[in-house]
């Protein structure tokens, strides 16, 4: 058995059943749950993020939920620091850190560090180009000035290539290009010869998703409509009424929230908002699958299987996470 303490990663696309399995594991093992979700960090954003209810959170406390106001940003680097601290605290108490969520960049940050600039992402670039077409590059330059004033000062509004790259870097990691460059120098001593941090844990990586993609699509559509029935629009109305929030913030760009925000702005009909919200969620799931397909050492489980808990426990024993 490894001398390193154990940790469990439970990944998967949105609406796959990660939270239910995580809570079942928490009932069976001495675990502490740590959220790996870039939307669950925000207070007052409960329905549209499918945040566990207060009752469930009281029974199954999660670290890194409700730690930011929607007006604030939260980078992958900040997540890494917070998650490592939470994992260390759990280990010190003799418990197993169980990290659950679908923000794959956060998992990557934990396993590999954040020394490198993120690579180009065609979907993020397509989204930026669409915004530029609708709003103009000057509007995007103003957006960059809010999140990375140093880069905005260097980049002219009529330089779309560099402007797109700076926005892309921020959107992919939640940290500005300027900050990344500074951290590359400051954190260089913490990196090993391969250029990657080594996570000081023996990590078992579980992934859950329906075997059939159409099953996941149906679950996504059903859940989005349930969110609307549960008061999602009223939740976004409360955010929309705040003068310090706008559509360019990471919180409001979260899947579902941007579509309801546009509905409240009169840009979309109710039917269009519903359709686009479902489509955006499916696109998120597709991106998550793309990450997961490139992941190594994953143990996959079918969301619809009735024996995922015993299967997960059996796997954890085979990889020496459990005695």
Swiss-Prot record:
Catalytic activity, per the record?
A: adenosine(37) in tRNA + dimethylallyl diphosphate = N(6)-dimethylallyladenosine(37) in tRNA + diphosphate
Keyword Acyltransferase tagged: no
Residues folding into a coiled coil are: none
Q: Would the keyword Membrane be found if you checked this record's keyword annotation?
A: no
Q: Which Pfam families match?
A: IPPT (PF01715)
| Binding residues annotated for ATP, in chain numbering | 12-19
Give the start-end ranges of region Interaction with substrate tRNA. 37-40, 161-165
The EC number of this protein is: 2.5.1.75
Q: Which residues are noted in the entry as substrate-binding?
A: 14-19
Q: Per its UniProt record, what InterPro entries does this chain match?
A: Dimethylallyltransferase, IPT, P-loop_NTPase
Q: Which cofactor does it need?
A: Mg(2+)
Q: Where is this site: Interaction with substrate tRNA?
A: 103, 125
Q: What interactions and quaternary structure are annotated?
A: Monomer.
MF terms in GO:
ATP binding; tRNA dimethylallyltransferase activity
Signal peptide positions on this chain: none
* SUPFAM superfamilies listed in its UniProt record: P-loop containing nucleoside triphosphate hydrolases
Q: What is this protein called?
A: tRNA dimethylallyltransferase
Which keywords label this protein? Answer: ATP-binding, Magnesium, Nucleotide-binding, Transferase, tRNA processing
Which HAMAP family does the entry mention? IPP_trans (MF_00185)
Could you state one GO biological process linked to this protein?
A: tRNA modification
